[in-house]
Amino acid sequence: AGLLRAPAAATLVRALRERFDLPVHLHTHDTAGGQIGTLLAAIDAGVDAVDAACSSMSGTTSQPSLSALVAATDGTERPTGLDIDKVFSLEPYWEAVRTIYKPFESGLASPTGRVYFHEIPGGQLSNLRQQAIALGLGDRFEDIEDMYAAANRILGNIVKVTPSSKVVGDLALALVGAGADPADFEENPTRYDIPDSVIGFLEGELGDPPGGWPEPFRTKALQGRAAKPRHTELTPEQESALATEPRRTLNQLLFPGPTREFEASREAYGDLSVLGTIEFLHGLEQGTEYEAEIEAGKRLILGISSVGEADRQGMRTVMCTLNGQFRPVTVRDRSITADVKAVEKAD
């Protein structure tokens, strides 16, 4: 989150140096805007490595500016050894890349000192804003920040790093969405619909928190729930799959929900990673041709020839081109409201 102040960084690095004969590597985000000072203090104290970001991608929920760090340490006893002109030359490229990913920005136009209050990690802040927008809470982000601080306190001020930070974020979103009073929730948690991630945390799925369990809240929240085993044994099939498909199997074990969604998408649409970033995130422009290499030496030429009018169900016929051949595709235009109600099909 970028909560480590410069004096504390110096104290921490020196203490680690005295106790451990290991490299010390400092990573911090720059949400409040003061972390270049923290890095410099850590460098003076003997840190071995620090993380920084290309200037055009730096600041706020990212890392401090690499250009600033190189310039600040040049001529000192501990320079980075990087050529500052070469570092500068990277900035235009990453500035262009950043415009492509603009929809996923955190929404922070400048540093904010509120991070010292709500303690939302930098990597989570942008994700949390996108989650809030998806839940229709995008215009209540200050309320979510306040509730995040309350949720963090209720859960015992836990160490917030994935996946524990998600637990706090899920609870904050749920309480804001329900219009809940955090004090009442803490006193009477069984009256509320508690997110699964919070229940899992309280049941010990993430291990025992360093500061102990938040009691009596934990006991109240788990009241009437059947205890789950702390560890799940792998089936013979899963053990075999780990040897042959380790990445896919680990995804299924660690993130079952997102993995199912990903595999359903790939089953329906194929491997979309062959598309360019702009085409994938922003769609195809009518009248423009695109190339996609689906395998070594095999390229497809894609395009959109025309887009038909929407019908009462909000469906449009899009005339696509594939290697010069026309292919009609019917898609739902989610920007318009359909007149006909959709009925869920039975299994």
Over which residues does each language-model region extend?
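Hydrophobic faces of well-ordered beta-strands that scaffold small-molecule active sites
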Residues: 22-28, 50-52
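Terminal or standalone catalytic/regulatory effector modules within metabolic enzymes
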Residues: 109-112, 119, 123-337
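Catalytic cores of alpha/beta
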Residues: 32-47
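Short, small-residue-enriched loops and turns at beta-alpha junctions
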Residues: 2-7, 30-35, 56-61, 114
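Structured functional modules or segments
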Residues: 343-347
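Conserved, mostly hydrophobic/aromatic
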Residues: 46, 69, 148
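Core active-site phosphate/anionic-ligand binding loop and the adjoining beta-turn-alpha structural block
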Residues: 37, 62, 71, 80-137, ...
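Active-site-adjacent beta->alpha loops and helix N-cap segments on the catalytic face
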Residues: 2-20, 59-68
